[in-house]
């Protein structure tokens, strides 16, 4: 004797499925390491790596089919050094002099990420994400040290190149850095470990000193977040 199985048409079963993908909002705090890379096309700007931390809060709109849309506000503090070499204007032979740049950068970041979650086992999930983000520069202070002869320093000043500590974002660089990011990570219950890479999309040079002067800022990060 066969017994008809009506569980497929059980309204309570449909309700469980509905609950699994119901719309909700998650709130998280996040902290981690980040590295920014300033990429330049000419010698008037030197490429530089800046290392530091980023902290902030995000909220995610959980959508059906394991998708989610995340945004929030993150604060970043990074620091880096490099040397910019110049031919001496005083030495009789070909000799280089240099400026040591010690740069401290502060910024806010507003990400807009599309997430996709892959359930693995119980509360263990993997996830990937992509989307744009807006990095808003607050300050980029260059605490430079000069190793220049008087003639070289005077020549640089005549070309409009700074030779004293200053904020690069006061008049030199654009504050809005538009990036596109990709990344992923692992999630257990309320905890996430994630990483990603952000590609700089726009030229940050506000007033080019030479034709075609271009600098963009890319970066990667690894962070930990906790869901309330």
Indicate where each model-derived feature is located.
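Extended hydrophobic secondary-structure segments that form protein cores and membrane-embedded regions
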Residues: 26-28, 72-74, 128-131
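Short glycine/proline- and aromatic-enriched beta-strand/turn motifs that initiate or cap beta-hairpins
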Residues: 1-58
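N-terminal hydrophobic signal/anchor transmembrane helix of membrane proteins
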Residues: 53-81
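Extracellular/periplasm-exposed beta-strand and loop segments of Gram-negative cell-envelope proteins
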Residues: 34-49, 78-107, 137-179, 203-215, ...
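Membrane-embedded beta-strand positions in outer-membrane beta-barrel channels/transporters
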Residues: 52-56, 109-113, 181, 221-223
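Short secondary-structure capping micro-motifs at structural edges
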Residues: 57, 97-101, 112-118
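Outer-membrane beta-barrel "beta-signal"
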Residues: 186, 216-228
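Outer-membrane beta-barrel transmembrane domain signature
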Residues: 61, 67, 110-206, 228
